[in-house]
Amino acid sequence: MSSDRAALKSAFLDAHGLADARRETLAGDASTRLYERLHRPGKTSLIFMDQPPSMESPPCPPGATDAERRALGYNARARLAAGRVEAFVACASYLRSQGLSAPEIIAADPATGLAVLEDLGDDLYAALVANGADEAPLYDAAVDALARLHRADPPPVLEADGLRWPFLTFDDLALRTGGEMFLEWWPKFAGMAPFSRDAEAEWETLWKPIRARGVAGASVFCHRDFHAENLIWLPQRTGVARVGLLDFQDAVRAHPAWDFSMLLHDARRDVSPKRATACLDRYLTLRPDLDRETFLADFHGLGALNSMRILFIFARQVAYYERPRYRALLPRVWGHLNACLAARELAPIRGWFDRHIPQDKRL
């Protein structure tokens, strides 16, 4: 961290009466954000979020064409928030308005990329289950939270504390980007020759109708990263508020199956088949407006697309950002992809993988 950035952070804390807080650095994630816990004598702790605005390529302007988005870079193509604090603040406000437990925003300055948040604690779903907690009540509550969120119709613009953030749709280019990046990165990562133009053309033909269904079903607030390391158990609260939510700033209007793929096709832990089936049954009971067979078909198709996106991200983390810990997660993600491709309707795509990516290259 530069001395200028350190001084800026100290000034921000001082302006909000937090200069005397003891600062504890927290473990980072795959993003460019940094977190600290602020300890205050006799008071509850807070979280200090640091996301320099210039660290990433820009987000997607609402009216940008596909060509303009491609020129702007990955965040605009995929409709990611580029770590913008105003996206986090606006999404948090919307989630809280739906009765869900996003952190309360104590202070925020989008211009500097700094914010102070409510501290929801350390009881991540992933850690609790790893230490022997029963996953059933945790996942039941997560499903209930998704059902609550998915029954609401989010507005085109999210607003909070004078900030506005466009709530964009997970459109064809955004869905396509994950697949395109997989085609680009996986051969380099696995030591393969680049895919031929014919293979890429066939790929596009196979995936286009699945993306079309994803866009047609884009009707809900999609957290986009709804998995066990972004969910915090808050047993002192009631109902869906027991599920604390993190890392939601990239939210988009999307198909409800996307969040379900993130929850059940978790890259970092195995959700038992029994629990996965129970989650799907519970969600569909809470959403009688959805047709079961149609939802499951979309869950498999979008789940496969999501798994490929994660494979690209982890391959890039290992090869480009030199974060080798992500390599250990790849076999599980391949397992999720293979499970999705086992669906009868995805047999042609399964055939593409069998022809173009040998088993020994599915690392």
Residues covered by each model-derived region:
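Active-site acidic catalytic loop and adjacent metal/ATP-binding pocket
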Residues: 32-39, 47-48, 149, 207-260, ...
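Active-site activation/catalytic loop segments of kinase-like enzymes and analogous catalytic loops
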Residues: 180-190, 253-290, 304-321, 333-341
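Active-site catalytic-loop/activation-segment of kinase and kinase-like phosphoryl-transfer enzymes
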Residues: 165-210
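ATP-binding pocket architecture of kinase catalytic cores
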Residues: 39-177, 188, 215-216
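ATP-binding glycine-rich phosphate-binding loop
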Residues: 18-41
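Juxta-kinase regulatory segment immediately upstream of eukaryotic protein kinase catalytic domains
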Residues: 1-22
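ATP/Mg2+ or Mg2+-diphosphate-binding catalytic cores
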Residues: 312-363
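All-alpha amphipathic helical-bundle segments outside canonical DNA-binding/catalytic cores
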Residues: 169-170, 292-303
